[in-house]
A protein has these predicted regions:
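C-terminal boundary of histidine-terminating zinc-finger modules
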Residues: 266-277
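Phosphate-binding loop that captures ATP/GTP phosphates
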Residues: 68-70, 74-123
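Conserved catalytic-core segment of NTP-binding enzymes
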Residues: 22, 151-154, 158-262
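Walker A/P-loop phosphate-binding motif and the immediately C-terminal alpha-helix
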Residues: 38-73, 202
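Extreme N-terminal, non-catalytic leader segments
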Residues: 1-45, 90
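Residue-level signature of catalytic and energy-coupling elements of molecular machines
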Residues: 36, 47, 73, 81, ...
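Short, hydrophobic alpha-helical segments
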Residues: 287-297
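Phosphate-binding/switch loop-helix module in NTP-utilizing enzymes
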Residues: 117-175
Length: 297
């Protein structure tokens, strides 16, 4: 029986042991993911754009359509997807084939670092050599993500959603780990600062030869609850589509709604709590676009 190591056990792994495990883990990873029809990364490069909330709503929306969906939080230091999908406090179960993921009330298989920690609010601490600590930590983080994907019994999935943490370096490591990624959705907002950072993520994905890259513009506008008028939150900047070497498709434009954050904080999706809201309808449009992609359309 194989168990995913706790973060204390990961921290005690020596460099030589880590290197010896990589080939074995890669083989397990390839075997495990062969049962997954579509590998979909939701990334940005910039924090604070609502990426995890969109991932959670996308996962729930696809599951409600009857798809077998898995979701993993690749943010080891600040995981939030487990809470948003209402599996906080769930106990992981070992099986002969590996570790069973937590199952959300909406039928989404979930794996997150918070499920491996004894205390939900405990910060993740890495034991590292006195020299080269940053490089060591990066290797450990990549190794843990490899285990999340390779040692968890995902089973036959229509899609596995990977919530990528902020930072273009995190995107780069994911692309190195999963060169066969099927789709990368890059979440942005209309702000000029976010556009600048996400443009770098676009370039990384294009250089990695990811065939399918889509943009999701979150907080695209604010809809007045009284009159229904939509107004821009950030003004108008150059479209990200124009930054790309080749035109990028816009997969979704999501209006700002404070209830989106409030619902995910409670472990519920906006498409379930406020299905008729403008933002929920926009999220459903994104779900429909991704569902067609999963089917091969």
């Amino acid at each position: 029986m194989r168990k995913i190591r706790t973060y204390q056990e990961v921290s005690h792994t020596t460099e030589s042991e880590l290197l010896e495990q990589v080939i074995e883990q890669q083989e397990r990873l390839a075997d495990r993911l062969s049962q997954v029809k579509r590998l979909i990364a939701i990334a940005s490069g910039k924090g604070g754009v609502g990426k995890s909330a969109i991932t959670a709503n996308l996962a729930v929306g696809l599951a409600k359509k009857g798809f077998k969906i898995g979701a993993t939080d690749a943010d080891l230091n600040g995981p939030s997807l487990g809470r948003m999908l209402n599996v906080s406090g769930a106990k992981l179960r070992d099986s002969a084939d590996g570790v069973e993921p937590a199952m959300s009330p909406d039928g989404v298989s979930v794996m997150s670092m918070e499920l491996l920690q004894n205390e939900a609010d405990a910060p993740l601490k890495w034991r590292e050599p006195s020299l080269g600590g940053f490089i060591w930590q990066s290797s450990l983080e990549t190794g843990v993500l490899r285990e999340f994907l390779g040692d968890v019994v995902w089973g036959d999935l229509d899609a596995l959603l990977i919530d990528v943490p902020p930072g273009t370096d995190k995107i780069k490591r994911l692309l190195e780990l999963l060169p066969s990624l099927d789709l990368m959705l890059l979440v942005t907002t209309p702000s000029e600062t976010t556009r600048f950072v996400v443009a770098k993520s676009i370039r990384l994905a294009q250089e990695a030869m990811i065939e399918n890259i889509g943009l999701v513009e979150n907080m695209e506008s604010h809809v007045c609850p009284s009159c229904g008028h939509a107004s821009r939150l950030f003004g108008t900047g150059q479209a990200l589509e124009e930054d790309a070497e080749e035109p990028l498709p816009q997969w979704g434009r999501i209006p700002f709604d404070p209830r989106l954050g409030a619902s995910t904080d409670q472990g519920r999706s906006l498409i379930s709590t406020e299905p008729d809201s403008v933002t929920a309808v926009a999220l459903e449009d994104l779900v429909e676009r991704v569902s067609k992609y999963i089917k091969g359309g």
